[in-house]
């Protein structure tokens, strides 16, 4: 019996040949821990300003499409377009995205940066879609986390409760949030977050539960359905004129929707 690396060719051999094959254990993949990866790579993005980090999040989808077109190199880091296996030290777009979110959350400890993030992130489409109120540092941290890889970020110390509470909220409110379960399984994501927490022996003690309840209270006050109502209110004067052409006065109705 021979042990081989897991590649396209070895999979073909596994399916078509009579000899016994086993794949080599990928120690890097098995032992991967984003907390360690974060500590080792966070300096790679230290030169990014807070505004630049926010620009990355706001344009995440467009940036991802460009980066994934070919091998993408910045500084000493290369994100490969294709790879047979992702090692524990390899940079990927998801890991880069998570690094930037961790960096931004850390920046909320500075009052000046907190105010900058608060004012800029309010215009991000995802924050508006969630109807998330940005009243304090905790709500801003939640805003930074929206759209991020919660299972990855949950491994970083002090990010456990914000990750698990947000995962629960997304699972509970996926319909209101417009999440397509075929594209993003919220239950699976929550399970992955809990698996990460269990693997690091995280204890949900009284202090952690208290912290989680604070995040849950903020999310409970958000209104995922508010975006359309706010937009309607913005055009209410003109919309009402068209309603009147149909013999209906809708000012009161628009106010109710808002």
From Swiss-Prot:
InterPro entries: Tospo_nucleocap. It is found in: Virion. Signal peptide: none annotated. Its main location: virion. Keywords: Capsid protein, Helical capsid protein, Ribonucleoprotein, RNA-binding, Viral nucleoprotein, Virion. One of its GO terms (cellular component) is viral nucleocapsid. GO terms for molecular function: RNA binding. It comes from the Viruses. Belongs to the tospovirus nucleocapsid protein family. The N-terminus and C-terminus are involved in homooligomerization and play an essential role in viral RNA synthesis. Homotrimer. Binds the viral genomic RNA. Encapsidates the genome protecting it from nucleases. The encapsidated genomic RNA is termed the nucleocapsid (NC) and serves as template for transcription and replication. The NC have a helical organization. This is Nucleoprotein. The lineage of its organism: Viruses, Riboviria, Orthornavirae, Negarnaviricota, Polyploviricotina. The gene is N.
